[in-house]
Amino acid sequence: MDYKARDILSVLKNVNLSVDAKVTHLLGLKSDIKQKNVPEKAVPVIFECLRHAIASPFHALYSAGFSTLGHFLKRLYIQEHHQLVAAMSDRILPTLVDRMGDNKDRIRQQTTHALADLWEGAGPQIENLVLSVGFQGKNPFQKQTCLNLLSIAFTRSEITAAYAEATAKEYLPQIISFVEDADPTVRQGARALLVQMFIGERDSSKHELKRALEQYKVRPSHAREILAGIGLDPELYDESHSSRQHSIQQRAPSRAATASRAPSRAGISRAPSRAAISRAASRADISRAPSRADTFDERSGSTTTHVDSSSAADDGAPVLHHPKPVRTSPVTGGMIAASDNRIAVTDSIPANDFDSPKQKNTLRTNASKASGMVNAPAGHAAAPSALGHAVEKAKRAVEPLDIEPYDLSSSQELDRLQATMAPWFEGRETEMNFQRREEYTILIRRITHGNAPQRWPTAYLGFVKMTLPFVFITANSVRTSLQTAGLRAVQSLARVNKERLDSSIHIVLQNVLKLCANAKGITSQNSNLTIVAILENVTCNQRVLNQITGAAKDKNQNMRIFSAGWLEIIIDGQNRHKTHAEGVNSIAACIQEGVEDAKEDIRRAYRHTFFRFSSVWPARAKKILDAVSPKTQKLIEKDMLKMSEDPFVSNSGSSATGLFSSTPARAAAKGVTTEKGKASIAVPKAMSSPKLASRSTQPVTTKTNTLQKKPTSTLSSAPMRPGAAKPRPATAAGFQLKKKENESPRKKQTPSRVPEPGLDTPITRRRQNSDPTQNESPTKSGWVAHAADDHHIGPLTIPKRRSTRDTETPRAKASKQADIEVEMDDKNYDGRADEIVQEKVNETVYETVDEMVDERANERVDEYFDEHVDERIDEMVREKVDEKVDEEVDEKVDEKVDEKVDEKVDEKADEKVDEKVDEKVNEKVDSAADDNLQEEVAEKRSMSLSDEIIASAQRPSDEVKERSSEAERASMGKGGSPRPEREYVDSTIVSESPLPKRAVSLWSQNSINAHGILLKGIERIQTRTMATDGYRKLQGLIQHHPDLFADEEQFAVLLIGLLDELAEQTPPSKSVLSLGTVSDHKTQVLFTVKYMFENFKKFFAPHYPGTVVALLEAEKSAEMGGHLIKAIENFIDDIVNASRAHYEIIGAVVTHLGPAVQNEAGPTEHRMLRKGLDVITHGLTSMKEREWELPPDQLERLGEFVRQVMTLPSVALKRRIFALCIALRELVDNEERFWELVGSKTKGVDGLLFYYRTRQEAQAA
């Protein structure tokens, strides 16, 4: 079978044979595998045959390859050759990885079953190579294949199922993230796999999955489906996201209640009566077990707010105020629910009283609060999308804790604990006290969530004031674990104590704000979460606002980004507390600076804050828009249009969605307006002017009120007409569409087109946020703004784009629109109905006008394209075609001429050499009498020109030969048998793109011609005259010809030349770099070495140490870019992994790095030292795993090198030095011998080594 497999391999490689012939041979091999045992010698060859067959683009051949692979693996498992499968799997896994992402379903299914069959013998290899690519890549087909692979592996043998279960648990976060993937098949596959994984697990594991779904913010519908599939009650997920009592007692009002119905006088917020206050106080004083209503009251809100309109500013601008906090019901132990040894505190969230938009910025937390105010004014009622907000409310309603609350038996325990903690927080942080500090900080948090705040509130508050400095000492630690513990303790203090922490709020904010400016990402993020928790729970006064606005103007970028989210919390939480103007002025100034910040991330964050600000104070928002640059205005309008399309960002607490609103909803289907409906649209001019409407102080009629109260559901199932296609932007090349007169913005419409409110006026439903017409161009209508409060109500239109025939400036148009603002008395709430009727009428008219504008615009665009654009496109295409043809013809002609000239020269040279050889041979034959001499003459007759040149090629020096012989001896195992060479898998398969398949010309496919090109290439590389394209041609030859090199010496000559060129500091000549840079040139040199490494591993093995040293030297080049340095480092890692003689690489690297350490290395040497230390550490670790030992002389040299690098001051090098010491200590496995090598046992070195070793053992455990 061995010889037959070799014949089949040659058949598969032969490009001249038909596909049917190859399939026939492969099926014959499959038949033999099914009937006979496979010898071990034939296994590598058969794997190579199957790799060629599976990689084929022909259906018959790759199908036969997959089928043969399945039977081949079954035969090897029957013969118990599992280790052989694991060793040979690297030959075929890269090909299967490529097939995982194929566009054809059949190929992906066959690949999945092949990998499942292979998993029993090569589970770790599949996990490292296949799943890491599929789960971390962006190809949805690869993700889907990996999920299917795990699902199939669960149903296979016990070995495969065990591997699959362990791998799936390791990749559980990625699988959960796939539940929210953009591809629907990936989402479905992830949900099915999670159900399959946990359906038979213990309840504790299922509850861990539930918490993971909550942590990764999986949408409730998907989470309920998964939990129902594994046997958990889906209502558990609902209860953790939103209280059932809250959903019963706090019903979200309909859209009619929020937008159509005028607020009644009874619904207006009024100051509570004395009797109500006394009753509330008396009931709060009664000590009793909390009821369900108490739980709901705490979650829905604990303060009573009101609007003080008497002290408003003269310009109608509302201002900021926070009422005096009132006592809240205590948090009791009955409200703490324990589930699966994890505690969830359902009452540790602040009293929330406003809606929350969906946050778009991932740098900011969801800092808004949920709507829970029962007696709030109608203008601030809950949004109709309350069902969509339920997910965000639930995230704040329950805080999953990883600690257990600590219950006390008496208040004296608090004093004893404080006295016990105090000594450990004195002085500086050391190795002796940092663990105690972390433990006591966690204990403070546990006490906060225990029974102390409820049973002994006075003693507990005293304890908090005494231990608050301890918490901040921990939060300001340099250790990340201590910082996290301190900041989470502050979050718990804020959530549990709420207004009781007001007296210390300025100290808390001052300390946490400093941490927000920390350069460490995890510290700044945790500090941001802490400030969010503080602002959501503690009273916001003028001093707090000053600290937040000061952070918004800080020079630190993190502070400015986070401040945008903090201002949103303040805006949402305090938008009804307006008694003085300083707060709003400060916020407006911060937003104006933020939207024009130099950093794009900050501008984007503040544009979202501007959207929230405009929904509360539209007049101030308009002033900000007028003050910023036109470019900033466009970006704000663009972002606000996207937010208005998002159903979770809509602010429907008033009759408008903010400063701008997109085009009103249209009819369900085009052309449904009947003649009767058209007749009802006719309106007299007297009711069309906004000014006239604003002057009307008479209450609206009963008929109009009836129209207002009609519900306008957003969940209608009526068919919706799809939105019009987006027009080409006016900035497109060759496109200048002129607007018609009748296509001007809506604010230019004549008053006669405004409909009259009456009985026959059809009331169109409000457009749903998911309506496709939301995506239409904003040039058809302005964004209409309506005030979100009762102080400043009136339409405000700002045009987005100026018409080509409009000569007015945007500022002039904005000023005109400011003139038509409706002024309304704050106390005359009946006038509100006029505006609602006007809005309803406008919606009815606008939908008809929009349909007409769409039709006219489409007709005009078609006409313009027919007249101008098609002709211009033809002209441009013609020019580009001519230019491209000229370039291609010149290039191809030059290439063909060069090939013909080389071919003719070689033919003539061969003829002359053959003649000369015949003459010399005849002379030798005449004088020869020995048979051996005649045989030698016959060999010389068969020599060609290429053979003579190869024989006369430059040979490597004696040093090269000596290194090669030493490497061969090193590659032998302990028993004298050669170690198997690892099949090379280039690192670009995982992190970058694979090596490209180079095209080879038909003339170069001849082996004799290829040898000639190789010799010319070696000569040009040695003289540094090889162009960049020449390296690409050389790569193609190396890839195409498996017998390109005559012997190992010729391979060594080319490799040494390439490495010298790569490490050369001086750039090549301008003729070589005529079409590229030095980085491009060296990239091709590196790729040539990688092609040699991949295709000639047997020749390359003796040169591993020298190649690593040369690559380290090449890293010092200042001309290299970051991508090239990364490629070099990946290549070094692959060489070290492939080597079986690590001690040679370690010795070569130590010898090379010695001078750099002694000469006080600079930045480029530091880069080389960092990678060199990593290589030594990697080699020592590999030797420890294989139970190999370093020779004594190399141990001494390595110890001397460690003593030298210990003195280097670089922090990055220090970490690598101690990692090297830890690896050396584990390899030596003798404490005294180790300290003899690295030097005397000093206190500092010993402590640091102990620290790093302890951390490493903890991570491994």
UniProtKB/Swiss-Prot annotation:
HEAT repeats lie at residues 92-130. Gene3D superfamilies: Leucine-rich Repeat Variant (1.25.10.10). Residues 804-833, 893-927, 956-971 have a biased composition (Basic and acidic residues). The keyword Nucleus applies. GO terms for biological process: astral microtubule depolymerization; cell division; mitotic spindle assembly; regulation of microtubule polymerization or depolymerization; regulation of supramolecular fiber organization. Keywords: Cell cycle, Cell division, Cytoplasm, Cytoskeleton, Microtubule, Mitosis, Nucleus, Repeat. Transmembrane segments: none annotated. GO terms for cellular component: cytoplasmic microtubule; microtubule organizing center; mitotic spindle; mitotic spindle midzone; nucleus; spindle microtubule. Interacts with microtubules. This is Protein stu1. The gene is stu1.
